[in-house]
């Protein structure tokens, strides 16, 4: 199995690569973790990971600047149905639009917009930085065997914006930060997490291993 982690100038690339290598090794999964900016290598990969940190518009520009990358993603993920994982802004780019300072078109895979978080508790700071529990709304193989909910493991978040999905069925999990905040989305062969699996210790490594095993 070859897993393509897309290098388009955004994301915790070294951390993500190391986390995938560790999760594969500890789970006994034979996987080549391929950090690449080559659209052809992405198109031929068995699984695809799109990381991302920073501003939505900047990440979209970076993706557009990689020759053939958006086309490769649409063909490989939508038409060929290869398993896909978006991380943080990589997840947000799955949406229709980002509304951060300006309107930026996303990939349009998940109906909804990425909007600024407005916690009901004014004492909660933006961005949300740190550890928070996740609450699964719809069961999914990426959460198999992972303790979630009030007594569950914590995931690591760093973000000021959230994906406001139009379809509740696309929201796999939420976290509580002055109200429900989308923590994970998914449908068909694609999933995305607002939190960073590569920084989420046991929860993150378990989720990555589940993604590597997942057969949508």
Swiss-Prot record:
Entry keywords, A to Z: Amino-acid biosynthesis, Cytoplasm, Glutamine amidotransferase, Histidine biosynthesis, Hydrolase, Lyase
Protein's UniProt keywords contain Signal: no
Lineage summary: Bacteria, Pseudomonadati, Pseudomonadota, Alphaproteobacteria, Hyphomicrobiales
Residues the record marks as active site: 88 (nucleophile), 196, 198
Catalytic activity, as annotated: 5-[(5-phospho-1-deoxy-D-ribulos-1-ylimino)methylamino]-1-(5-phospho-beta-D-ribosyl)imidazole-4-carboxamide + L-glutamine = D-erythro-1-(imidazol-4-yl)glycerol 3-phosphate + 5-amino-1-(5-phospho-beta-D-ribosyl)imidazole-4-carboxamide + L-glutamate + H(+); L-glutamine + H2O = L-glutamate + NH4(+)
GO cellular component: cytoplasm
The encoding gene: hisH
Protein name: Imidazole glycerol phosphate synthase subunit HisH
Biological process (GO), any one: L-histidine biosynthetic process
Organism: Brucella abortus (strain 2308)
